Amino acid sequence: MKICKGLAITLFAVWCGTGTISAAEGPGAQGKDPVYPIAQGAVQAEIGSAAPLFVLDGVVGQEFKKISLSDYRGRWVVLFFYPGDFTFVCPTEITGFNAALDEFGKASADVLAVSADSKFSHLAWLKSDALGKIGYPLLSDFTKQTARAYGVLDENTGTPRRGLFLIDPAGVIQYLVVHGDKVGRSVEETLRVLVALQTEELCPLNWKPGASTIRPKK
């Protein structure tokens, strides 16, 4: 009986999402930065391009909050999409990135996680004790516009693929990777690439923080 009740609560949480705001908003509204609107069906995300801006409903701790990508301008952002709450591989990624928050902080980077689940589903998941305390926002792309803009929406299932983007302080995508649903991503590799990008130098195969970079002779 308890299992059925818990399942009913979970299904209700997923179903009753009110949707999310997925639109360009931020400093551009004050004329300081350009605004990159998310158009239906548009795929704008590629290395060297401006990261599509968004404002999404999210859960921070156990409170609802609207999160705007533009609020993170001036810092690196680790933005990763995942297929869904209450799954199997996804919680290992959510908790894995959370365990490395201090390391990302040392690299002046903030972490944001996005799925197409409702904010109510996120809250129910966080309250289920399956994740423990998570120190970064879980965002709800209920309309799927953000996942579509970043080119990671599986149109057949309506869920995001495991896409990860490193966005620099100027709001430009510097790295992206997309995994199949069955394979989780590597926190260690994400940190390695992040630090490598921050050197702004040539980093050879398997380069690790503290190792020598390549400096062509003039």
Residue locations for each model-derived region?
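Chalcogenol-based redox active-site neighborhoods
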Residues: 23-218
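Bacterial N-terminal signal peptides that target proteins for export
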Residues: 1-8
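Bacterial N-terminal signal peptides
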Residues: 8-19
